[in-house]
Amino acid sequence: MERQADKLSVTASAVIWFGAAVSVAEILTGMLFAPLGWRMGLLAVAIGHMIGGMLFYLAGLIGAQTGRSAMETVQLSFGRRGSLLFSAANVVQLVGWTAIMIFTGAQAAAALTAGWSGAQTVWGVIIGALILLWLRIGMRNFSKINLVSMGTLFALTLWLSVQVASGEPAAAGQADAEAMSFGLAVELAAVMPLSWLPLVSDYTRRAGKARAATLSATLAYFCTSSWMYAIGLAAALFAGQSEIAPMLQYAGLGAAGILVVVLSTVSTTFLDAYSAGVSFHSISSRFGEVVVASAVTLLGTLLALVFDVSRFEGFLYFIGSVFAPMIAVQIADYFVLKRKPASGEVDWVSLALWLAGFVFYRLMLKWQPPLGTTLPVIAATFALTLLVRKLLPSVGKAAVREG
């Protein structure tokens, strides 16, 4: 039984997810919305985050109510071995996110210290080392340190917002990004909270108050992530900036800009690395969570130093195609059908339902529906799961292979 001191408070939950949402990657993604203009761009951000935020809350609530990690909640629907597919996919996406976050953070910090020789490499190593230090501190002490660092980050981000948004609207003409449909923009907003679905229960499982802590995490992430997208959009439209470093310089944030970049990168990437350890532990318990998280940090740092990973839209769509249908099956099973945990090693019906959703997602990307891809995929997979489980129960029972 977990000690009360180890429980995550409502405030601590919000602070963690505020830190997760303040990231260079989210600002960069917001910059891509510039072709839509200010009003339509913000509308796409809001709709996408509402879709992703709803799924974020439901995924986190399953973990909070059951006390299970994210990948352990996946086992409830897909079976012990069936969940390994998603554990492996999650580790892969987290290694990818670690590399992307360290790369973009180091690139921005390097541009602010352009006089340094090999500045990007140096900052990449510094950020990687700080993430390792955060991992050594551990989750119990992390929330205490994070409260101080996030307070600093909040103040700096407020200043950044005011400076970026104070530009002349006429500068919007300088933003000359590739044309983007409204539906594609909604999807790019939805997949950012969607990327946290395989992680959120790793933290909400420790919640002292399941619903309240999960709601505070969801609202903190929803509001802050939307804010980051809006900063990126405003930077592109009103300040004529399409990269992080010039934007920070435009806002008059020299050394403070470096602090924003480093703090936001470390606080977000810590969660990626830690959850990679938790996910890998569900595949093999041979290595501890912190050991694996440290290895992921080192690998991500190496990838960030060797490869250019500055464009990652395709990576976001991959995440959406894997995890959107996964959570649709889980939501139907847990909240509506109230199914007992899968008794076999692999629940083939659940995997078939997921595969149908995966294929549908990839097809929908080509069609670009007006409200994005995630919403119709979730609705279709959810409805199909209810249909198969309620109207064809014999199919579900026969397809489960007992361990």
PLM feature segments, named:
Residues A46-F78, L85-Q93, R389-S394:
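Juxtamembrane transmembrane-helix boundary signature
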Residues L135, G151-A177, F182-A185, A189-L194, ...:
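Hydrophobic alpha-helical segments and their helix-loop junctions in multi-pass secondary transporters
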Residues I16-A21, F86-V91, I102, T113-I137, ...:
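Transmembrane alpha-helical segments of multi-pass small-molecule transport proteins
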Residues S83-G115, V266-S282, P325:
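Hydrophobic transmembrane alpha-helices that form the core helical bundles
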Residues M1-M40, S181-V186, P198, R205-L215, ...:
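Membrane-interface "cap" regions at the ends of multi-pass membrane proteins
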Residues A177, A328-G403:
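C-terminal membrane-solvent junction of multi-pass transporters and transport-like membrane proteins
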Residues M31-L61, G82-L84, Y221-C223, A380:
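Extracellular loop-to-transmembrane helix junctions
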Residues V122-I127, I131-V164, D176-A177, T214-Y221, ...:
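Membrane-interface loop-to-helix entry segments
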